[in-house]
Swiss-Prot record:
It is a multi-pass membrane protein. It comes from the Eukaryota. This is Chitin synthase 3. Keywords: Cell membrane, Cell wall biogenesis/degradation, Glycosyltransferase, Membrane, Transferase, Transmembrane, Transmembrane helix. Signal peptide: none annotated. It comes from Exophiala dermatitidis. The gene is CHS3.
Length: 885
């Protein structure tokens, strides 16, 4: 028979129940589990007739159907259930004329070119059917708060293990219904007093660990990677056998809450919502854009699920006979109606949900960051074992693709350089700062805080960066700040760290937890990389200056004398770091020029032998490279002040390559200098055969190469020694060379672009924030109770289940990355023409000036005049001026 789902068919399930889709990634955990007979994904509970059904919700739907395409002539046949014939009277039952088949779901929009438009259509009441459903009356909490329980699809209910379904509080709908709340208030007003509540608090559960995932517009692969990693970490905690804490006072999973905060409906990827709907945390068609005309600020969904979707779209289900099954996870999904930025998302987390749940520890993750095995438990243990620990972070490393430490993404030098940066930061910077007690930045992508430690002034100062509070805060708000403070909040996590350590009367400290690891995706192209580092560099510089200027507040804290001594040492270290960063532009140029002059100019110090191209060619090549260096340095200012990185991609790629080639040349010169210093017997080189005193004198002589050797030893030796001591040296072999070649670009391109765009603080909303597609909720007075009620559509379970099939197909469909269109806008073309015009004008005039005034021109052999200095410059100028007159 023809398929009722055009364009995407369902597979028959073999009677042996050992079907598995073709693997997409051989190293995926779900794929390995599917290869074993006793795995959590091939159990007897995959059979819809072998598992006890949820009481009162008899259904033929389970999650054992395959949604990956197959024989178009076949669809799964399910038994006919008379329960759904006329549950609400005539006109509301199953009108399917084919007994034995489920009610046809809506057309599958997965092959639609615009998933957002398909999502908008699904929000309409009664989408996918021409039937009229019965309605139910829902009371508003305290007459103003709309909070409704919706039945979840039977397949999701049936996936819950019996031991959890049977161990519920009386009358609980935790596993059978999803709870939706339309929050029409500010996060600060999301309180019990105003009628808002959350399920863990309603069930009187203590929340020990609140895991928050902040999201902007990441695709479903990145989101699933993070969420599945969190589910695996919850399993690690629940499976602890000898824990003195987690196994007391109730099941461990009831002490953990996972909170997803999505920053706006418009920017979010609608395929990601399908993934959340597949595990039961979201449903289409239930959100309300306003309640009695009062705009909804955030849509809050709550459900406890045992399902998970991996990064390669494999559905993970539990098995009663397997200890590796995922335990239930209490989920809170907060979908903000408008894009209000990350700080506002954290205000929902801490001020709204945190105050109701009152967790002990909050772990912050960005969508796309995957926590490693037992990483979240390692973070929590650090807090459990240290009562004065206020914040902590783990090791973040770059995502390198298949192959682990030798992943194929390392072929991209930009990724390799970032990988080296992350590794060295985790080996040298973080442990050093952790020993002082103050880690200058706990990355927002992977960090943890003790909730009561950040309450009060730390969060108060942190939330000054929330532009939704700008009117309330006045001059202290983001709109009243000067440009320096606005940039400071681009690195808001640094502000929170400083305020936490400097909290008056407290002695909280920060720490780095080596055992906790996470991987994150990094930019792979120059435009994205430059844009990311603009925010990082400007924010970190402003935040560092803020911390140094307000260091005196440390004296009001409760730290002891030893801690204060080390904090002073760290302050001096930070001052030196800021100064070195400030003068790094000149430092790189001076290093390049001095090394070229030392090795490339024939002189008595090098036995009148220039290296590497001989006495004639080497000075010429060095001069060309030096002028190219300065020219491209000037070009960076022109590009940064007038162009977007995406509009000048080619120019930036050429700049990266040129600075890399010059750096390679300088490295060769420095190596030659070191070798020559120990092998020649020139008086200006290092003396190795006349005793220690002469060796020291020659090594540190003003004309000797000792300082170069020290710099090289500090660069090469320190990194190698520290990496091997850390037992993690692989980045030295796979990424060190790329990092060395890109070091000048990090200064000459990134810092110039960042400081040239200091005015760009990127505040304000992105996108159009369209929520007009959502229906409104209008209250009516109930004739009997005289209270405000809302009439809500009451769908039969059969229709919920049939529509769920299309949702799962969309969620588990192979991910196809969107094609990036690099079409330049008209404004980009105008800016590029302006850049070329200005660059041509400046460089042509500079070339003329250099040709007349510089003695370096003689090296090219264009003139044999014996004159030097002003005399030759005057003669050249007059010679040029004569034909003009």
């Amino acid at each position: 028979m023809a398929s009722q789902y055009p364009g995407h068919q369902l597979d028959d399930i073999p009677s042996t129940n050992v079907y598995r889709p073709p693997p997409r990634h051989e190293d995926d955990e779900a794929e390995h589990a599917l290869l074993h007979q006793n795995s959590a994904y091939q159990s007897q509970y995959d059979d819809p007739h072998s598992r006890p059904l949820t009481p009162g919700q008899e259904s033929v739907y389970t999650l054992n159907e395959s949604y990956v395409g197959g024989d178009p002539s076949k669809v799964p046949v399910t038994s006919y259930n008379p329960q759904y014939t006329q549950p609400y009277g005539q006109g509301y039952g199953m009108n399917n004329s084919r007994p034995g088949f489920p009610t046809p779901g809506p057309p599958d929009p997965i092959d639609r070119t615009d998933s957002t438009e398909a999502w908008r259509e699904r929000q309409a009441p009664g989408f996918g059917t021409i039937k009229r459903y019965a309605t139910r009356k829902v009371k508003l909490v305290q007459g103003s708060v709309l909070s409704i329980d919706y039945p979840v699809p039977s397949a999701i209910q049936n996936a819950i293990q019996a031991k959890y379904r049977n161990d519920l509080e009386g009358g609980s709908e935790e596993f059978t219904h999803m709870r939706y709340t339309a929050a029409t208030c500010d996060p600060d007003d999301f309180t019990l007093k105003n009628g808002y509540n959350l399920r863990p608090a309603m069930y009187n559960r203590h929340t020990e660990l609140l895991i928050a995932i902040t999201y902007y517009n990441e695709d479903k692969v990145l989101t699933a990677r993070t969420l599945h990693g969190v589910m695996q970490n919850i399993r690690d905690i629940v499976n602890l056998k000898k824990s003195e804490f987690w196994n007391k006072g109730g099941p461990a999973w009831q002490k953990i809450v996972v909170c997803l905060v999505f920053d706006g409906i418009d920017p979010c990827d609608k395929n990601t919502l399908d993934v959340l709907a597949t595990i039961g945390v979201y449903q289409d068609g239930v959100m309300k854009k306003d309640v009695d005309g009062k705009e909804t600020v955030a849509h809050i969904f709550e459900y406890t699920t045992q399902l998970s979707v991996t990064a390669n779209q494999q559905l993970i289900r539990p098995n009663d006979n397997d200890a590796t099954s995922l335990p239930p996870a209490q989920m809170i999904f907060c979908l903000k109606q408008k894009n209000r930025k990350k700080i506002n998302s954290h205000r929902w987390l801490f001020n709204a949900f945190g105050r109701i749940l009152n967790p002990e520890v909050c772990i912050l993750l960005d969508a796309g960051t995957k926590p490693g095995s037992k990483s979240l438990m390692a973070l929590w243990q650090a807090f459990y074992n240290d009562k004065d620990l206020g914040g902590a972070c783990g090791e973040i490393h770059a995502m390198l693709g298949p192959g682990g430490v030798f992943g194929r993404k390392l072929l991209n030098p930009l990724v390799a350089a970032q990988n080296f940066e992350y590794k060295i930061s985790n080996i040298l910077d973080k442990p050093l700062e952790s020993s002082f007690g103050y880690v200058s930045v706990l990355p927002g992508a992977f960090s943890a805080y003790r909730f009561r430690a950040i309450m009060g002034r730390p969060l108060e100062q942190y939330f000054h960066g929330d532009h939704t509070l700008s009117k309330t805060l006045g001059k202290k708000g983001i709109e009243g700040m000067n440009i320096f403070k606005k940039n400071m909040f681009l690195a808001e996590d640094r502000i929170l760290c400083f305020e936490l350590v400097a909290k008056a009367g407290s002695k909280w400290h920060l720490s780095y937890v080596k055992a906790s690891k996470a991987e994150t995706d990094v930019p792979e192209g120059p435009p994205e990389f430059i844009g990311q580092r603009r925010r990082w560099l400007n924010g970190s510089f402003a935040a560092s200056m803020y911390c140094l200027m307000h260091f005196s507040r440390m004296y009001k804290s409760g730290h002891n004398l030893i801690r204060m001594f080390f904090l002073h040492i760290q302050m001096i270290y930070n001052i030196v770091s800021v100064l070195l960063s400030w003068f790094s532009l000149a430092s790189f140029w001076l290093t390049t020029k001095v090394l070229m002059d030392l090795v490339g100019q024939p002189s008595t110090s090098n036995d009148n032998a220039a290296f590497p191209f001989g006495n004639t060619a080497t000075p010429i090549i060095n001069t060309i490279l030096q002028y190219l260096y300065l020219a491209f340095l000037l070009l960076q200012f022109i590009l940064a002040l007038g162009n977007r990185p995406k509009g000048s991609k080619v120019a930036y790629i050429i700049s990266f390559c040129l600075f890399g080639l010059i750096q390679l040349y300088v490295i060769v010169l420095s190596m030659y200098l070191v070798v020559r210093a120990f092998t020649t017997k020139n008086g200006t080189d290092i003396v190795t055969n006349e005793g220690a005193n002469e060796f020291v004198k020659s090594f540190f002589a003003s004309t000797g190469p000792g300082i170069v050797i020290i710099a090289l030893a500090a660069t090469f030796g320190l990194y190698f020694v520290a990496s091997f001591l850390y037992m993690d040296p692989w980045h030295m072999f796979t990424s060190f060379a790329q990092y060395l070649l890109l070091m000048p670009s990090f200064i000459n391109i990134l810092m110039i672009y960042a400081f040239s765009n200091w005015h760009d603080v990127s505040w304000g909303t992105k996108g159009s924030d369209k929520a007009d597609v959502l229906p409104s909720a209008q209250t009516k007075k109930d004739e009997k109770s005289k209270t405000a009620v809302v009439e809500e559509v009451d769908k039969p379970q059969a229709d919920i289940d049939s529509q769920f099939e299309a949702t799962v197909r969309r969620a588990l469909a192979p991910y196809k990355p969107p094609e990036e269109k690099e079409e330049k806008t008209l404004e980009d073309s105008y800016k590029n023409f302006r850049t070329r015009l200005v660059a041509t004008w400046i460089f042509s005039n500079a070339l003329l000036a250099v040709a007349i005034t510089s003695d370096s021109l003689d090296r090219f052999g264009f003139t044999s005049e014996p004159l030097r200095g002003p005399a030759i410059s005057s003669r050249r100028f007059c010679g040029l001026l004569r034909p003009c007159l």
